[in-house]
Regions:
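ATP-dependent adenylate-handling active sites, centered on carboxylate activation for C-N bond formation
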Residues: 1-136, 150-162
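Conserved S-adenosyl-L-methionine
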Residues: 138-148
């Protein structure tokens, strides 16, 4: 079974890491079947632009608390993407995350928190990204909706929870 093979390869019980590695296993397999050797992702956007509920919870602690959450989430994401690339390498595919480059991280951290999240009740978040999407012509239905993470939309999360 793929999930146990991945669990063994990445050697962690972290549910999110396992879910993401399973999802990218299939993404990489598909990319390879299409003769692609690189897949570019938007990983890092939620970490850098306050996309998680943890940022709502941290909001009352001000910028310093939000920065602390951001640094923790970025550290986890950078490590997880190494595991993802280990899985993708089976198909000779590289998963690239331009939003997790050190230069982009440095830039994103200069954007005011108020452009990312408005308050502790803000369910939409990532406002500057949504404004940019509108500006460049992304259809409204795409930039006004909350996104669903790959592991949830693909039902991997549910399947893994059921198998435990």
């Amino acid at each position: 079974e793929i999930s146990s093979k991945i669990h063994q390869t990445i050697n962690t019980d972290n549910l999110s890491w396992n879910e993401n590695c399973i999802a990218f296993y299939y993404v990489s397999k598909l990319a390879n079947s299409l003769n692609l050797d690189t897949v570019i992702t938007a990983n890092g956007i939620d970490e850098l632009f306050c996309g998680y509920n943890a940022y709502r919870e941290a909001f009352s602690g001000g910028d310093s608390q939000i920065t602390k959450v951001m640094d923790t989430k970025l550290d986890n994401e950078l490590k997880m993407m190494k595991a993802v690339n280990l899985i993708a390498s089976e198909f000779k595919v590289k998963i690239v995350q331009p939003l997790l480059s050190s230069k982009f991280i440095e830039y994103a951290k200069t954007i005011p928190t108020s452009e990312k999240i408005h308050d502790s009740e803000d369910l939409l978040r990532k406002h500057i990204i949504r404004k940019l999407a509108n500006h460049v012509g992304v259809p409204e239905i795409s930039y006004t909706k909350r996104k669903k993470a790959l592991q949830y939309g693909s039902k991997i999360h549910k399947a893994l929870l059921k198998s435990k």
